[in-house]
C-alpha cells in the first residue's frame, strides 16, 4: 500500500514538472510604449523565442511563459533599450520577427521579416524597462 501511495505522489510530481511556468513581472518606466521579446530554454537542447509583449508607458503587468522550467535560462529584449547594455550583463543574440507576434521553436537566422537582436539575461522575476 505504501508503495502505491509513493508511486502516486511521484507521478503527480512528474506531471506538475512537465507543466512548468515562469512568471515575470514587467514595469515600463519610460515615456513611450515598449515591446518585449523573450528567448528561453525549454529543455537541454531547445530554445524558444517569442514576442511581442507590448507595455504602455507606466504599465505594470506579468508575462507568463509556459513550458519554461528555469527563470535563470530566460533572456529579454526590449525595443526601447536598443544597444543599451551594461558591460557586466550576459547577452545572447537571437532572431525576432520584425512586425508581428511570433513564437519560434526553431532558429530563424537571416529569414525574411526577421532581424537579429541582443537579448539580456534576466536576473530576477522582475524586469523594469528604463531609458
Annotated model-derived regions:
Residues 4-16:
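Sec-dependent N-terminal signal peptides
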Residues 18-29, 33-68, 75-131:
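Intrinsically disordered, low-complexity segments enriched in small/polar residues
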